[in-house]
Amino acid sequence: MCLIAHLVAGFALGSALKVSLWILVPAALGLHVLLDLVPHWDYGFTLRRPWWAYGDFALSAATFVVCYRYLGFTERALLTGLVSAAPDLDILLSVLPLRWRLKWFPSHWASFPHGRAGQALGILTQAGAVAVCVALLALTHPSS
């Protein structure tokens, strides 16, 4: 899934689960793997891959700032969002003009059974996942 989907899912996980960070942080990484199993569309196979990656990163960074500064997300939710999204930074690194393009997270390896779908259905799948996470956040995030 795109970086933004992993970020919002991590926010929801950190907001919903009231457990130790020792449990929550590994759970956020596990959530990343589970979301990558769901059939979805990845921009990694398009000619415009760098622009999709830059846009995804910019949208995710802006979302993080808004959630931190204006929506009052807890530190746990913010941390869990970052941990869940962090493995996708190797996707961003892979589109930069660098020699090093190692994909270090297991769900990004060619041997991983990554869920795949066409562009329209795959984007809808991710939008649906984000919508579920936003609904969960609405139920679990304390009002300001």
Task: Kindly give the residue locations of the regions a language model identified.
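N-terminal membrane-targeting hydrophobic helices
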Residues: M1-S144
